[in-house]
Structure formats: C-alpha cells, structure tokens
Regions:
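N-terminal zymogen propeptides
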Residues: 1-80
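Predominantly the structural core of cysteine protease catalytic domains
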Residues: 2-20, 91-94, 104-105, 130-276
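Intrinsic-disorder/low-complexity coil detector
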Residues: 15, 35, 52, 59, ...
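A generic signature of intrinsically disordered, low-complexity regions enriched in glycine/proline
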Residues: 23-24, 29, 35-39, 83-88, ...
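General structural signal for secondary-structure boundaries
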Residues: 27-28, 39-42, 116-126, 130, ...
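Substrate-binding/charge-relay-adjacent region of secreted/lumenal peptidase catalytic domains
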Residues: 59-149
Length: 276
C-alpha cells in the first residue's frame, strides 16, 4: 500500500484519508446547507445496553500488519465480502438517518459474510417508524432497537427512492422486513480504536462495525483496517452518501478520526435463504 498527497492507494484506487490536518475543512464542506446529504449522529443521546459487551481479546498492534496481510491474501475482510456480494452504498439523502443507514449497511455486509449475495436492504422504514416520521438524528443502539422491533425490508419491497411513510402498512414490506429483524450486536468500548481494529481484524470472525463519530456528527461503518504508513493505521469506512462520495462511497479515517464515541459490531444476522 502506498500513500500519496491525494490519500491512500488501494487496488489502484485513491481513497481519501481524513486526519487532523484536513478534518475541519472536510466537515465544513458537508455542513454547507446546499449539500444534498445530511449527517445525524447525536452523541449526546447515546445510551448503552443495546448489545452484549465486546467478547473478544484486544489484538496487540504488533500483530496487525500480519492480519491485514492475511485478510488481503484470503479476501476475508468484511470489505472483501461487501464488494464480492455487491452490497450497495446507501443513500440517506437529506434525512438525518445516518445512524440507521450506517447500521443497515453493516447489516447488509454481515449478510454478505453469511453468503447472501445481491441483498439490498432499505434502512428508511425502521428509522421513519422509530422517529414517528420526523427528520431527526439518532445513534446506533437506537437503530438496533428499531430493527429488532420492525426489521428492515429489501429495496424490492420498499424502493430506495421512497422517502416517506406511504408503504408502512404494506403487507409485502412487513414480510420482507421481518426476514431481517434479529440482529446480534456487541458494544465496543467507547473511544477505543484498538477494540474497533480487533473486531474488524479478527482472523476467524471479522465483523463490520458502526462508527458513531462525535467530531463529525455522523455515523458510518468500518469494513477494513489499513496501514496508512509504517506503524500508523486507519479504518476504511463506507458512507451513506451514494457512490459519489469519496471513492465508490468509501474513504479512510486515520486513527485520530476513527476513534468513535459509539461502536457496535454486527456479530450475526437472522438466517435467510439466498436472494433469488
């Protein structure tokens, strides 16, 4: 992996790296009222207890380079599964539902790891129901609560571009959502970058994880640990601002910016048959 002034090069693609040198300018751009996308992570509202405690050991940093190499060679990171299964980069548009869209993207990636290809979940419904149709922010644990209550339908039942409650009482939507309503989550320690990296790097059971970032006021999900330079690591993340964001919807957060106020590992999802 090489680093240039444009960011980190991965598989021939330049991924934007967000660190202390550019974060303030970066946030300023996306705080512009003319920007078609919103954030919506409310760190002041975060509560714990929506998942089990993190059950794994913290992997020593000296082992990270070998594990990064292991996942690259075996194409076994959550990101490899995400790409192979065609998991979509989601579009929250101007709704402050990043907390649900990031959670939904991580769910979709966990299904990819379970061998389900072509699945396209739509996070809008549980967010809309949970917030009573209001366009307001939230947090990852709240997303988990609403998904376990109502599920999350596929886009085939609730099209991606339907950003209203018109389909809430549709029977097909209800059936589709209930296929994806039992999510097992582990809560990682707040602001613990090593726990986040250990979750994603686990050699046997790597998991995608939501990243609620207080400095950004936004929630994304992490899919891969990368080495930005010798001894310096970051997290490749997937945003919910369409593929027009970053490189194919993704970017890299340096450690100082990937240290998340709320971190939820998606450990398992409800079993289902393959998508036809």
């Amino acid at each position: 992996m090489n680093v240039t002034e444009f960011g980190m090069v991965e598989d021939g693609q330049k991924l934007p790296v967000i660190d202390d040198s550019n974060a303030s300018d970066f946030v300023k751009v996306f705080d512009d009222d003319r920007n078609p996308f919103r954030s919506g992570f409310e760190s002041s509202e975060v509560k714990t207890g929506f998942g089990s405690p993190f059950s794994r050991s913290i992997i020593p940093r000296k082992e990270w380079p070998d594990l990064i190499r292991h996942h690259e060679e075996n194409k076994s990171s959550p990101d490899h599964h995400r790409i192979h299964a065609g998991v979509p980069v989601m579009n929250q548009a101007n709704w402050g539902y990043c907390w649900m869209y990031g959670f939904g993207g991580a769910m979709n990636t966990a299904y990819a790891q379970a061998g389900i290809k072509g699945l396209r979940l739509n996070p809008f419904m549980p967010a809309w129901l949970g917030k009573g149709g209001r366009n307001v922010g939230g947090f990852g644990g709240e997303a988990k609560k609403y998904v376990n209550k109502w599920g999350m339908p596929e886009e085939s039942a609730w099209p991606e571009n339907v950003k209203n409650g018109s389909l809430v009482e549709n029977h097909e939507v209800e059936l589709s959502a209930k296929m994806h309503d039992a999510i097992v989550v582990e809560e990682l320690e707040r602001n613990n970058f090593d726990a986040l990296a250990s979750c994603i790097l686990d050699p046997e059971r790597p998991c995608p994880a939501t990243m609620g970032l207080a400095w950004w006021g936004h929630l994304v999900y992490g899919v891969k640990v990368v080495m930005i330079s010798p001894g310096k690591f970051g997290i490749k993340f997937v945003n919910s601002w369409t593929i027009k964001y970053g490189k194919e919807g993704c970017g890299v957060l340096a450690e100082s910016k990937a240290t998340a106020f709320e971190q939820l590992a998606i450990v398992s999802v409800k079993p289902r048959v393959a998508v036809s």
